[in-house]
Amino acid sequence: MMTYQEIFNEIKNKAYFKNHRHVLIAVSGGVDSMNLLHFLYLFQDKLKIRIGIAHVNHKQRSESDSEEAYLKCWAKKHDIPIYVSNFEGIFSEKAARDWRYAFFKSIMLKNNYSALVTAHHSDDQAETILMRLIRGSRLRHLSGIKSVQPFANGQLIRPFLTFSKKDLPEIFHFEDSSNRELSFLRNRVRNNYLPLLKQENPRFIQGLNQLALENSLLFQAFKELTNHITTTDLTEFNEQSKSIQYFLLQDYLEGFPDLDLKKSQFTQLLQIIQTAKQGYYYLKKDYYIFIDKFSFKITKIVPKTELVKDEKMLEYDSNLCYRDYCFSFMPKSNEDQGQVSIPLFSLSSIKLRSRQSGDYISFGHFSKKIRRLFIDEKFTIAERQNAIIGEQDEQIIFVLIGNKTYLRKACKHDIMLAKLYIDKLEKG
Protein backbone atom coordinates (compact mmCIF):
# COMPACT_ATOMS: atom_id res chain seq x y z
CA MET A 1 0.00 0.00 0.00
CA MET A 2 1.26 3.48 -0.89
CA THR A 3 0.62 6.87 0.67
CA TYR A 4 -0.92 9.70 -1.35
CA GLN A 5 2.43 11.51 -1.16
CA GLU A 6 4.20 8.52 -2.73
CA ILE A 7 1.54 8.37 -5.45
CA PHE A 8 1.94 12.11 -6.06
CA ASN A 9 5.73 11.78 -6.36
CA GLU A 10 5.28 9.30 -9.20
CA ILE A 11 2.44 11.13 -10.94
CA LYS A 12 3.92 14.65 -10.93
CA ASN A 13 6.75 13.68 -13.31
CA LYS A 14 4.21 12.55 -15.92
CA ALA A 15 2.72 16.05 -16.14
CA TYR A 16 -0.80 14.77 -16.81
CA PHE A 17 -2.34 18.09 -15.76
CA LYS A 18 0.22 20.47 -17.27
CA ASN A 19 -2.26 21.91 -19.77
CA HIS A 20 -5.36 21.70 -17.57
CA ARG A 21 -6.83 24.02 -14.95
CA HIS A 22 -10.35 22.64 -14.47
CA VAL A 23 -10.74 18.87 -14.32
CA LEU A 24 -13.84 16.72 -13.86
CA ILE A 25 -13.53 13.57 -11.72
CA ALA A 26 -15.76 10.57 -12.45
CA VAL A 27 -16.80 9.32 -9.00
CA SER A 28 -18.92 6.21 -8.49
CA GLY A 29 -18.40 6.00 -4.72
CA GLY A 30 -16.31 2.82 -4.94
CA VAL A 31 -12.85 2.50 -3.41
CA ASP A 32 -10.96 3.42 -6.60
CA SER A 33 -12.85 6.60 -7.44
CA MET A 34 -12.99 7.72 -3.80
CA ASN A 35 -9.20 7.38 -3.65
CA LEU A 36 -8.92 9.44 -6.82
CA LEU A 37 -11.24 12.11 -5.40
CA HIS A 38 -9.34 12.41 -2.12
CA PHE A 39 -5.96 12.37 -3.87
CA LEU A 40 -6.82 15.16 -6.32
CA TYR A 41 -8.56 17.18 -3.61
CA LEU A 42 -5.44 17.03 -1.40
CA PHE A 43 -2.99 17.81 -4.18
CA GLN A 44 -5.01 20.16 -6.39
CA ASP A 45 -2.93 23.18 -5.36
CA LYS A 46 0.35 21.44 -6.14
CA LEU A 47 -1.08 20.22 -9.45
CA LYS A 48 -2.46 23.73 -10.12
CA ILE A 49 -5.96 22.47 -10.88
CA ARG A 50 -9.52 22.92 -9.63
CA ILE A 51 -11.79 19.90 -9.50
CA GLY A 52 -15.44 19.04 -10.03
CA ILE A 53 -17.30 15.78 -9.39
CA ALA A 54 -19.46 13.88 -11.88
CA HIS A 55 -21.63 11.05 -10.55
CA VAL A 56 -24.12 8.79 -12.32
CA ASN A 57 -26.83 7.14 -10.23
CA HIS A 58 -27.67 3.97 -12.15
CA LYS A 59 -30.77 3.33 -10.00
CA GLN A 60 -30.03 -0.41 -9.95
CA ARG A 61 -29.52 -0.86 -6.19
CA SER A 62 -31.36 0.30 -3.09
CA GLU A 63 -28.15 1.95 -1.82
CA SER A 64 -27.74 4.11 -4.93
CA ASP A 65 -29.68 7.09 -3.57
CA SER A 66 -27.81 7.12 -0.24
CA GLU A 67 -24.48 7.03 -2.11
CA GLU A 68 -25.59 9.98 -4.23
CA ALA A 69 -26.65 11.86 -1.07
CA TYR A 70 -23.27 11.19 0.58
CA LEU A 71 -21.34 12.52 -2.41
CA LYS A 72 -23.50 15.64 -2.56
CA CYS A 73 -22.90 16.23 1.15
CA TRP A 74 -19.14 15.67 0.75
CA ALA A 75 -18.99 18.07 -2.19
CA LYS A 76 -20.90 20.76 -0.28
CA LYS A 77 -18.66 20.37 2.78
CA HIS A 78 -15.51 20.74 0.67
CA ASP A 79 -16.96 23.44 -1.61
CA ILE A 80 -16.58 21.32 -4.75
CA PRO A 81 -19.12 21.51 -7.61
CA ILE A 82 -20.93 18.24 -8.23
CA TYR A 83 -23.00 17.13 -11.21
CA VAL A 84 -25.39 14.16 -10.99
CA SER A 85 -27.27 12.23 -13.65
CA ASN A 86 -29.85 9.45 -13.20
CA PHE A 87 -29.62 6.59 -15.69
CA GLU A 88 -32.75 5.97 -17.75
CA GLY A 89 -33.65 3.11 -20.07
CA ILE A 90 -32.97 -0.62 -20.22
CA PHE A 91 -29.87 -1.35 -18.17
CA SER A 92 -26.84 -3.15 -19.59
CA GLU A 93 -23.10 -2.69 -19.14
CA LYS A 94 -22.81 -1.00 -22.51
CA ALA A 95 -25.90 1.18 -22.07
CA ALA A 96 -24.65 2.33 -18.65
CA ARG A 97 -21.18 3.09 -19.97
CA ASP A 98 -22.54 5.02 -22.97
CA TRP A 99 -24.81 7.01 -20.63
CA ARG A 100 -21.93 7.85 -18.28
CA TYR A 101 -19.56 9.08 -20.94
CA ALA A 102 -22.24 11.06 -22.76
CA PHE A 103 -23.03 12.74 -19.43
CA PHE A 104 -19.36 13.43 -18.68
CA LYS A 105 -18.91 14.92 -22.15
CA SER A 106 -21.91 17.22 -21.78
CA ILE A 107 -20.69 18.49 -18.39
CA MET A 108 -17.22 19.18 -19.76
CA LEU A 109 -18.61 21.16 -22.69
CA LYS A 110 -21.13 23.14 -20.64
CA ASN A 111 -18.81 23.97 -17.74
CA ASN A 112 -15.42 24.40 -19.43
CA TYR A 113 -13.64 21.39 -17.97
CA SER A 114 -10.72 20.42 -20.19
CA ALA A 115 -10.09 16.97 -18.71
CA LEU A 116 -12.09 14.02 -17.42
CA VAL A 117 -10.21 11.95 -14.83
CA THR A 118 -11.09 8.33 -14.06
CA ALA A 119 -9.68 5.90 -11.47
CA HIS A 120 -8.73 2.98 -13.74
CA HIS A 121 -5.65 1.12 -12.46
CA SER A 122 -3.44 -1.72 -13.72
CA ASP A 123 -5.87 -4.40 -12.47
CA ASP A 124 -8.59 -2.84 -14.65
CA GLN A 125 -6.13 -2.87 -17.54
CA ALA A 126 -5.46 -6.59 -17.08
CA GLU A 127 -9.20 -7.33 -16.81
CA THR A 128 -9.83 -5.46 -20.06
CA ILE A 129 -7.09 -7.37 -21.92
CA LEU A 130 -8.33 -10.75 -20.66
CA MET A 131 -11.93 -9.88 -21.57
CA ARG A 132 -10.85 -8.97 -25.09
CA LEU A 133 -8.89 -12.21 -25.42
CA ILE A 134 -11.98 -14.16 -24.31
CA ARG A 135 -14.12 -12.30 -26.86
CA GLY A 136 -11.62 -12.98 -29.65
CA SER A 137 -10.65 -9.35 -30.26
CA ARG A 138 -8.13 -8.41 -32.92
CA LEU A 139 -4.47 -8.01 -32.02
CA ARG A 140 -4.62 -4.21 -32.24
CA HIS A 141 -7.36 -4.14 -29.60
CA LEU A 142 -5.14 -5.90 -27.07
CA SER A 143 -3.27 -2.64 -26.48
CA GLY A 144 -5.54 -1.97 -23.54
CA ILE A 145 -6.43 1.35 -21.95
CA LYS A 146 -4.39 4.50 -22.60
CA SER A 147 -3.34 6.75 -19.73
CA VAL A 148 -4.22 9.83 -21.82
CA GLN A 149 -6.50 10.06 -24.85
CA PRO A 150 -8.63 12.72 -26.57
CA PHE A 151 -12.14 13.13 -25.15
CA ALA A 152 -14.87 15.75 -25.66
CA ASN A 153 -13.19 19.16 -25.82
CA GLY A 154 -10.03 17.96 -24.10
CA GLN A 155 -8.58 14.76 -22.67
CA LEU A 156 -9.49 11.66 -20.69
CA ILE A 157 -6.77 11.07 -18.08
CA ARG A 158 -6.17 7.90 -16.03
CA PRO A 159 -3.40 8.83 -13.56
CA PHE A 160 -3.67 5.56 -11.55
CA LEU A 161 -3.12 3.28 -14.54
CA THR A 162 0.43 2.34 -13.52
CA PHE A 163 -0.67 1.46 -9.96
CA SER A 164 -2.35 -1.74 -8.84
CA LYS A 165 -5.46 -1.86 -6.68
CA LYS A 166 -3.41 -2.99 -3.67
CA ASP A 167 -1.26 0.18 -4.00
CA LEU A 168 -4.23 2.41 -3.16
CA PRO A 169 -4.80 3.45 0.49
CA GLU A 170 -7.72 2.19 2.56
CA ILE A 171 -10.44 4.82 2.51
CA PHE A 172 -14.15 5.18 3.21
CA HIS A 173 -16.10 3.97 0.22
CA PHE A 174 -19.27 2.17 -0.80
CA GLU A 175 -19.27 -1.49 -1.77
CA ASP A 176 -21.23 -2.12 -4.94
CA SER A 177 -23.05 -5.41 -4.40
CA SER A 178 -23.51 -5.78 -8.17
CA ASN A 179 -19.72 -6.25 -8.49
CA ARG A 180 -20.26 -9.79 -7.21
CA GLU A 181 -22.96 -10.68 -9.74
CA LEU A 182 -21.52 -13.24 -12.15
CA SER A 183 -23.96 -12.37 -14.94
CA PHE A 184 -21.43 -9.72 -16.06
CA LEU A 185 -18.28 -10.90 -17.87
CA ARG A 186 -16.04 -8.38 -16.11
CA ASN A 187 -17.18 -9.69 -12.72
CA ARG A 188 -16.45 -13.28 -13.79
CA VAL A 189 -13.01 -12.20 -14.99
CA ARG A 190 -12.31 -10.27 -11.78
CA ASN A 191 -13.73 -12.73 -9.26
CA ASN A 192 -13.21 -16.11 -10.94
CA TYR A 193 -10.76 -16.22 -13.85
CA LEU A 194 -7.98 -13.88 -12.72
CA PRO A 195 -7.64 -15.41 -9.21
CA LEU A 196 -7.24 -18.88 -10.78
CA LEU A 197 -4.70 -17.66 -13.33
CA LYS A 198 -2.75 -15.84 -10.61
CA GLN A 199 -2.45 -19.17 -8.79
CA GLU A 200 -0.64 -20.51 -11.87
CA ASN A 201 1.43 -17.34 -12.25
CA PRO A 202 1.44 -14.74 -9.44
CA ARG A 203 2.67 -12.16 -11.97
CA PHE A 204 -0.08 -12.89 -14.50
CA ILE A 205 -1.55 -9.36 -14.25
CA GLN A 206 1.87 -7.81 -14.86
CA GLY A 207 2.28 -10.15 -17.83
CA LEU A 208 -1.02 -9.04 -19.37
CA ASN A 209 -0.10 -5.39 -18.91
CA GLN A 210 3.32 -5.98 -20.49
CA LEU A 211 1.56 -7.65 -23.43
CA ALA A 212 -0.64 -4.56 -23.82
CA LEU A 213 2.39 -2.25 -23.71
CA GLU A 214 4.39 -4.22 -26.28
CA ASN A 215 1.35 -4.49 -28.54
CA SER A 216 0.87 -0.72 -28.38
CA LEU A 217 4.55 -0.16 -29.23
CA LEU A 218 4.29 -2.65 -32.10
CA PHE A 219 1.43 -0.79 -33.78
CA GLN A 220 3.09 2.57 -33.16
CA ALA A 221 6.21 1.24 -34.92
CA PHE A 222 4.05 -0.01 -37.82
CA LYS A 223 2.53 3.46 -38.22
CA GLU A 224 5.94 5.11 -38.21
CA LEU A 225 7.30 2.67 -40.80
CA THR A 226 4.30 3.04 -43.14
CA ASN A 227 3.38 6.72 -42.73
CA HIS A 228 4.77 7.45 -46.22
CA ILE A 229 2.12 5.17 -47.78
CA THR A 230 -1.21 6.63 -48.89
CA THR A 231 -3.43 3.70 -47.98
CA THR A 232 -6.33 4.70 -50.24
CA ASP A 233 -4.09 5.02 -53.32
CA LEU A 234 -4.65 1.71 -55.11
CA THR A 235 -1.25 1.73 -56.80
CA GLU A 236 0.59 2.27 -53.53
CA PHE A 237 -1.65 -0.15 -51.64
CA ASN A 238 -1.19 -2.98 -54.12
CA GLU A 239 2.58 -2.51 -54.19
CA GLN A 240 2.70 -3.68 -50.57
CA SER A 241 2.91 -7.27 -49.38
CA LYS A 242 -0.33 -9.00 -48.39
CA SER A 243 0.60 -8.81 -44.70
CA ILE A 244 1.23 -5.05 -44.85
CA GLN A 245 -2.01 -4.54 -46.80
CA TYR A 246 -3.86 -6.38 -44.03
CA PHE A 247 -2.65 -4.02 -41.32
CA LEU A 248 -2.86 -0.89 -43.50
CA LEU A 249 -6.56 -1.58 -44.03
CA GLN A 250 -7.06 -2.26 -40.31
CA ASP A 251 -5.38 1.04 -39.53
CA TYR A 252 -7.57 2.88 -42.07
CA LEU A 253 -10.72 1.35 -40.57
CA GLU A 254 -9.79 2.75 -37.15
CA GLY A 255 -11.10 6.05 -38.54
CA PHE A 256 -14.60 4.52 -38.64
CA PRO A 257 -15.11 3.20 -35.07
CA ASP A 258 -18.86 2.61 -35.46
CA LEU A 259 -18.40 0.52 -38.62
CA ASP A 260 -17.11 -2.48 -36.62
CA LEU A 261 -16.65 -5.08 -39.38
CA LYS A 262 -16.64 -8.75 -38.47
CA LYS A 263 -13.54 -10.74 -39.43
CA SER A 264 -15.31 -12.33 -42.42
CA GLN A 265 -16.50 -8.90 -43.61
CA PHE A 266 -12.98 -7.50 -43.24
CA THR A 267 -11.52 -10.36 -45.30
CA GLN A 268 -14.13 -9.81 -48.03
CA LEU A 269 -13.41 -6.06 -48.08
CA LEU A 270 -9.67 -6.68 -48.38
CA GLN A 271 -10.24 -9.03 -51.33
CA ILE A 272 -12.41 -6.44 -53.11
CA ILE A 273 -9.68 -3.80 -52.75
CA GLN A 274 -6.91 -6.21 -53.80
CA THR A 275 -8.76 -7.11 -57.00
CA ALA A 276 -9.61 -3.42 -57.62
CA LYS A 277 -13.21 -4.14 -58.62
CA GLN A 278 -14.54 -0.68 -59.46
CA GLY A 279 -17.91 0.38 -58.12
CA TYR A 280 -19.92 0.91 -54.94
CA TYR A 281 -20.05 -1.82 -52.30
CA TYR A 282 -22.33 -1.66 -49.29
CA LEU A 283 -20.62 -2.57 -46.01
CA LYS A 284 -22.93 -2.06 -43.01
CA LYS A 285 -24.49 0.64 -40.83
CA ASP A 286 -25.00 2.99 -43.81
CA TYR A 287 -21.33 2.74 -44.84
CA TYR A 288 -20.16 1.84 -48.32
CA ILE A 289 -16.82 1.69 -50.11
CA PHE A 290 -16.34 3.26 -53.51
CA ILE A 291 -13.50 2.05 -55.72
CA ASP A 292 -12.43 3.75 -58.92
CA LYS A 293 -9.41 3.20 -61.15
CA PHE A 294 -7.03 5.04 -58.85
CA SER A 295 -8.29 4.92 -55.28
CA PHE A 296 -10.83 3.70 -52.76
CA LYS A 297 -12.74 5.48 -50.04
CA ILE A 298 -15.15 4.47 -47.28
CA THR A 299 -17.99 6.92 -46.78
CA LYS A 300 -21.14 6.99 -44.71
CA ILE A 301 -24.26 7.18 -46.86
CA VAL A 302 -25.84 10.59 -46.42
CA PRO A 303 -29.43 10.30 -45.16
CA LYS A 304 -32.04 11.81 -47.45
CA THR A 305 -32.84 14.44 -44.83
CA GLU A 306 -29.24 15.65 -44.99
CA LEU A 307 -29.38 15.86 -48.78
CA VAL A 308 -32.49 18.02 -48.51
CA LYS A 309 -30.66 20.39 -46.13
CA ASP A 310 -27.96 20.83 -48.78
CA GLU A 311 -30.42 21.98 -51.45
CA LYS A 312 -30.64 25.60 -52.64
CA MET A 313 -33.30 27.23 -54.83
CA LEU A 314 -32.23 29.73 -57.48
CA GLU A 315 -35.02 32.05 -58.62
CA TYR A 316 -35.01 33.62 -62.08
CA ASP A 317 -33.10 36.89 -62.38
CA SER A 318 -31.29 36.43 -59.07
CA ASN A 319 -27.77 35.48 -57.98
CA LEU A 320 -26.69 32.64 -55.72
CA CYS A 321 -23.37 31.28 -54.53
CA TYR A 322 -23.45 27.53 -53.90
CA ARG A 323 -20.41 25.58 -52.82
CA ASP A 324 -17.52 26.76 -55.03
CA TYR A 325 -19.64 28.43 -57.72
CA CYS A 326 -21.66 31.57 -58.36
CA PHE A 327 -24.88 31.22 -60.39
CA SER A 328 -26.47 34.23 -62.11
CA PHE A 329 -28.53 35.26 -65.13
CA MET A 330 -26.19 38.03 -66.29
CA PRO A 331 -22.97 37.39 -68.24
CA LYS A 332 -19.74 39.11 -67.26
CA SER A 333 -19.05 42.31 -69.20
CA ASN A 334 -15.65 41.00 -70.26
CA GLU A 335 -15.36 37.73 -72.09
CA ASP A 336 -14.37 35.03 -69.63
CA GLN A 337 -13.32 31.71 -71.05
CA GLY A 338 -13.97 30.09 -67.66
CA GLN A 339 -17.63 31.15 -67.50
CA VAL A 340 -20.13 28.40 -68.29
CA SER A 341 -23.46 29.30 -69.88
CA ILE A 342 -26.48 27.02 -69.86
CA PRO A 343 -29.52 27.63 -72.10
CA LEU A 344 -32.82 27.72 -70.23
CA PHE A 345 -36.15 26.80 -71.79
CA SER A 346 -38.14 27.71 -68.68
CA LEU A 347 -38.05 30.56 -66.17
CA SER A 348 -39.01 28.34 -63.25
CA SER A 349 -36.78 28.22 -60.18
CA ILE A 350 -33.73 25.94 -60.37
CA LYS A 351 -32.90 23.52 -57.57
CA LEU A 352 -29.18 23.03 -56.89
CA ARG A 353 -28.34 19.84 -55.01
CA SER A 354 -26.17 16.75 -54.66
CA ARG A 355 -26.67 13.58 -56.67
CA GLN A 356 -29.36 11.24 -55.38
CA SER A 357 -30.03 7.59 -56.04
CA GLY A 358 -31.93 7.09 -59.30
CA ASP A 359 -30.95 10.43 -60.86
CA TYR A 360 -30.73 10.45 -64.65
CA ILE A 361 -30.27 13.04 -67.41
CA SER A 362 -31.81 13.02 -70.89
CA PHE A 363 -29.43 13.25 -73.86
CA GLY A 364 -32.20 13.26 -76.46
CA HIS A 365 -32.66 9.79 -77.95
CA PHE A 366 -31.44 8.18 -74.72
CA SER A 367 -31.20 8.89 -71.02
CA LYS A 368 -28.36 8.00 -68.71
CA LYS A 369 -28.18 7.44 -64.99
CA ILE A 370 -25.89 9.97 -63.33
CA ARG A 371 -24.14 7.16 -61.47
CA ARG A 372 -23.30 5.42 -64.78
CA LEU A 373 -22.19 8.74 -66.29
CA PHE A 374 -19.72 9.24 -63.45
CA ILE A 375 -18.37 5.70 -63.84
CA ASP A 376 -18.04 5.89 -67.63
CA GLU A 377 -16.28 9.25 -67.48
CA LYS A 378 -13.95 7.96 -64.73
CA PHE A 379 -14.50 10.79 -62.27
CA THR A 380 -12.74 10.48 -58.92
CA ILE A 381 -14.57 9.92 -55.63
CA ALA A 382 -13.99 13.53 -54.58
CA GLU A 383 -15.35 14.86 -57.88
CA ARG A 384 -18.48 12.71 -57.59
CA GLN A 385 -19.14 13.86 -54.04
CA ASN A 386 -18.78 17.52 -55.04
CA ALA A 387 -20.88 17.27 -58.22
CA ILE A 388 -23.76 19.75 -58.48
CA ILE A 389 -27.09 18.74 -60.01
CA GLY A 390 -29.30 21.44 -61.54
CA GLU A 391 -33.00 20.51 -61.56
CA GLN A 392 -35.82 22.52 -63.13
CA ASP A 393 -39.45 21.51 -63.51
CA GLU A 394 -38.57 18.10 -62.00
CA GLN A 395 -36.01 17.40 -64.72
CA ILE A 396 -32.23 17.46 -64.43
CA ILE A 397 -31.02 20.14 -66.83
CA PHE A 398 -27.31 20.05 -66.05
CA VAL A 399 -24.62 18.21 -64.13
CA LEU A 400 -21.58 20.19 -63.01
CA ILE A 401 -18.65 17.97 -62.08
CA GLY A 402 -14.92 18.62 -62.06
CA ASN A 403 -14.19 20.92 -64.97
CA LYS A 404 -17.03 19.54 -67.10
CA THR A 405 -20.70 20.39 -67.53
CA TYR A 406 -23.26 17.95 -68.97
CA LEU A 407 -26.49 19.44 -70.35
CA ARG A 408 -29.92 17.99 -70.92
CA LYS A 409 -30.68 17.73 -74.63
CA ALA A 410 -33.40 20.21 -75.59
CA CYS A 411 -36.57 18.98 -77.27
CA LYS A 412 -37.22 19.91 -80.91
CA HIS A 413 -39.79 22.60 -80.14
CA ASP A 414 -38.09 24.08 -77.03
CA ILE A 415 -37.54 27.83 -77.16
CA MET A 416 -34.60 29.32 -75.25
CA LEU A 417 -35.88 31.98 -72.84
CA ALA A 418 -32.72 32.82 -70.89
CA LYS A 419 -29.22 31.69 -69.98
CA LEU A 420 -27.76 30.63 -66.65
CA TYR A 421 -24.14 31.68 -66.09
CA ILE A 422 -21.81 29.79 -63.78
CA ASP A 423 -18.51 31.12 -62.46
CA LYS A 424 -16.01 29.28 -60.29
CA LEU A 425 -15.24 31.21 -57.13
CA GLU A 426 -11.63 32.15 -56.63
CA LYS A 427 -10.02 30.72 -53.50
CA GLY A 428 -7.57 32.99 -51.84
UniProtKB/Swiss-Prot annotation:
Q: Which UniProt keywords apply?
A: ATP-binding, Cytoplasm, Ligase, Nucleotide-binding, tRNA processing
GO molecular function (one)? tRNA(Ile)-lysidine synthase activity
Q: Which Pfam families match?
A: ATP_bind_3
Q: Which GO terms describe its biological process?
A: tRNA modification
**Keyword match Manganese:** no
EC class of the enzyme, as a word: ligase
Catalyzed reaction equations: cytidine(34) in tRNA(Ile2) + L-lysine + ATP = lysidine(34) in tRNA(Ile2) + AMP + diphosphate + H(+)
Q: Extract the CDD domains matched here.
A: TilS_N
Highest taxon in the source lineage: Bacteria
Instruction: List the protein's name.
Output: tRNA(Ile)-lysidine synthase
- Which species is this record about? Streptococcus pyogenes serotype M3 (strain ATCC BAA-595 / MGAS315)
- Gene from which this protein is expressed: tilS
